Swiss-Prot record:
Gene: MIA40
Mitochondrial intermembrane-side segments: 62-266
Name assigned to this protein: Mitochondrial intermembrane space import and assembly protein 40
GO MF terms held by the record: protein-disulfide reductase activity
Swiss-Prot/TrEMBL keywords: Disulfide bond, Membrane, Mitochondrion, Mitochondrion inner membrane, Oxidoreductase, Protein transport, Redox-active center, Signal-anchor, Transit peptide, Translocation, Transmembrane, Transmembrane helix, Transport
UniProt entry tagged with the keyword Nucleus: no
Domain of life (superkingdom): Eukaryota
Segments of skewed composition (Low complexity): 130-157, 165-175
Compartment(s) of residence: Mitochondrion inner membrane
Species, as recorded: Eremothecium gossypii (strain ATCC 10895 / CBS 109.51 / FGSC 9923 / NRRL Y-1056)
Subunit structure: Monomer.
Source taxonomy: Eukaryota, Fungi, Dikarya, Ascomycota, Saccharomycotina
Transit peptide per record: 1-28
Segments for region (Disordered): 87-180, 242-266
């Protein structure tokens, strides 16, 4: 509205200026025919008219299409930005879904691994207990065999002790007089062992056995019998029979020990 009013006012002013200029030009042109008058043109009025005409043209030129075009151009990038944002959201949605599914798969795999580890940890004590039971079951026969071998050796040693004690007892019955408490070293039952190279050692061992009050009888005379056996080995020509009996007893003891070891190996 303001532009229309301004344009109208400028047109009126321009019209008045042009009319005034034409009137002056008519007045002065009448003098040209006789050559007496001079051609006088009002230049300020023409300049004002030209300026008003240019300003009117500038004011009349439509500016709305440019503004509309600028508005359309400004709206287009906004629409493009909205479309790009929507496309980005749509593209990010599958990625987010994929990442969530991947995380869910990792959690499930971790849960399965944890369950497997727990099962293995729970199974280890049972396996260890089973192995201990098998080891004990395998060791039990060996222990029983070893105990049986030890018992057998003890029985053999006891039998040997009984045999020696029996011989000593037989000699004691003939050589020892319980009424007087004396020992007859010349008794034939002693086989002359009291008068040989190891007679003193024999007497010490025999007397220890006769007067022993330990249980079993003669158990406190082992050292004296050992001294007597050592003396026998130093004089094999006189005590061959006794040494042979001793060697036989040693062989039997070694055989029993080897048999026990072979049983343990099986």
């Amino acid at each position: 509205m303001f532009r229309q009013v301004s344009v109208r006012a400028l047109r009126r002013a321009a019209g008045r200026s042009v009319c005034a200029s034409r009137a002056q030009m008519v007045r002065h042109s009448s003098t040209l025919g006789g050559g007496k008058g001079s051609y006088n043109l009002d230049m300020p009025a023409l300049a004002l008219a030209a300026g008003v005409t240019l300003l009117a043209g500038y004011m009349v030129y439509p500016r709305a299409p440019k503004a509309k075009q600028a508005a359309v151009q400004s709206v287009a990038p906004v629409n493009e930005n909205v479309e790009q944002a929507s496309a980005s959201l749509q593209a990010s949605a599958p990625v987010q879904a994929t990442s969530e599914s991947a995380e869910a798969g990792e959690e499930e795999a971790y849960g399965e691994e944890s369950g497997a580890v727990n099962e293995e940890a729970a199974g280890e004590p049972e396996e260890a207990a089973a192995e201990v039971g098998e080891t004990q079951a395998e060791q039990a026969p060996a222990v029983e065999t070893e105990q049986a071998a030890e018992a057998e050796q003890a029985a053999e040693a006891a039998a040997e002790d009984k045999a020696s004690a029996g011989e000593a007892a037989q000699g004691q019955q003939g050589a020892y007089n319980p009424d007087t408490g004396e020992i007859n070293w010349d008794c034939p039952c002693l086989g002359g062992m009291a008068h040989g190279p190891c007679g003193e050692e024999f007497k010490a061992a025999f007397a220890c056995f006769v007067y022993s009050e330990a249980e079993p009888k003669g158990i406190d005379c082992v050292e004296k019998f050992q001294v007597m056996q050592d003396c026998f080995r130093q004089h094999p020509e006189h005590y061959a029979e006794q040494l042979e009996s001793e060697e036989q007893a040693v062989r039997e003891t070694e055989a029993a020990a080897e048999s026990a070891k072979s049983d343990e190996g099986h």
